[in-house]
Amino acid sequence: MTETQFMNFYNEYLKEQILPTMIGKGLGQYSNPNNRFHNFEQLEQLKKEPREKCLTDLVGKQIVCLYDIMKLWDGKLTPRLNNLFDELIKDIIIYMFLLRGMIKELEMKPKVSGVGLEDWHE
């Protein structure tokens, strides 16, 4: 795939798959109209873990599912498998946008003392 072909694919995928879900069509699955992070905040209460951790747990589930499929995949693409790839990849991308939004929201809050991301080292 050339750079131009990839950019065309990328733009079309965002326009037809990601944006409709993030903006409205699938909104109820990820949040309520007044709070984009509602589901994760509710999960935070249930699990007693930060909403960002709850979100990354869900992403982990999607990645493990994708990984398991790839281990067994023989390289043939059926319509059902193609749809499954689309759903998993789309969900992972949307979760990443939501995580970035949560981090952005944290950036806008007043700083509190304690261990934070700035103390984390690779």
Predicted regions and their residues:
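Intrinsically disordered, low-complexity regulatory regions
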Residues: M1-E122
